[in-house]
Amino acid sequence: MSVPTVLERIIARKFQEVAERSARVSLAELEGLAKAADAPRGFANALIEQAKRKQPAVIAEIKKASPSKGVIREHFVPAEIAVSYEKGGATCLSVLTDVDYFQGADEYLQQARAAVSLPVIRKDFMVDPYQIVEARALGADCVLLIVSALDDVKMAELAATAKDVGLDVLVEVHDGDELERALKTLDTPLVGVNNRNLHTFEVSLETTLDLLPRIPRDRLAITESGILNRADVELMAINEVYSFLVGEAFMRAEQPGLELQRLFFPEQVKKTVQQLD
């Protein structure tokens, strides 16, 4: 019998988590909270408009830890990081809410969103419509659907729930088969290509470059993971990829927003440093 991969263990835990949470707060209660939440901020639209101008559309991630790296950031204040990102030029935020594997929390999303005016995606492992409604109740503007964690029927069901509650969907793929499934099953304009293999956690930017020709022009290709320096950003720009999801490179920096500027808006860095002085 093969040993479950990290992704398989996470998904198994998510089913347990949904059972535990729905025993505490019913779906009907959650739907009421979702209806009462602040209006969505337009996650997809913000990215599309920025990328249209061939400007970096950056989803800046707020992440304390990961299964592959352990704790990434010791000094972790989500609201503070969110403000830093907004000042640094982020288009959107991504907040990890997975507790067991990423040391995330629902409260981190709420704290980050309350501190800024940027749209926010709930970065978690969605396996049940309950989690989608929960995301809207927490104030999220978008949810992540990971193709490798879902079959086509479940993927379509989760996307339909997202639409019902007013959430955008970012679908995440890692290879050609997953991309084909995503394009066939979902009409979301946001297609994230994760350069990290979620089974092995190995990273290669070639993943984005290989899949790019197969992503229709009416969808927005977002490269995720492994963007660490200006050369990586420039490589993507040459290939007309202007949308990025970046976490670790920022989280390891003393000032995450300043690191965002260094990577994506270097002409702004001098100005910011002068202001800080």
Swiss-Prot record:
Organism: Pseudomonas putida (strain ATCC 700007 / DSM 6899 / JCM 31910 / BCRC 17059 / LMG 24140 / F1)
EC number: 4.1.1.48
CDD domains in the cross-refs: IGPS (cd00331)
InterPro entries: Aldolase_TIM, Indole-3-glycerol_P_synth, Indole-3-glycerol_P_synth_dom, Indole-3-GlycerolPSynthase_CS, RibuloseP-bd_barrel
Pathway(s) where this gene product acts: Amino-acid biosynthesis; L-tryptophan biosynthesis; L-tryptophan from chorismate: step 4/5
MF terms in GO: indole-3-glycerol-phosphate synthase activity; phosphoribosylanthranilate isomerase activity
Keyword Transmembrane helix: no
Keyword flag Isomerase: no
Homology family: Belongs to the TrpC family.
The reaction(s) this protein catalyses: 1-(2-carboxyphenylamino)-1-deoxy-D-ribulose 5-phosphate + H(+) = (1S,2R)-1-C-(indol-3-yl)glycerol 3-phosphate + CO2 + H2O
One Pfam family of this chain: IGPS
Keywords tagged on the record: Amino-acid biosynthesis, Aromatic amino acid biosynthesis, Decarboxylase, Lyase, Tryptophan biosynthesis
GO biological process, one term: L-tryptophan biosynthetic process
Official protein name in the record: Indole-3-glycerol phosphate synthase
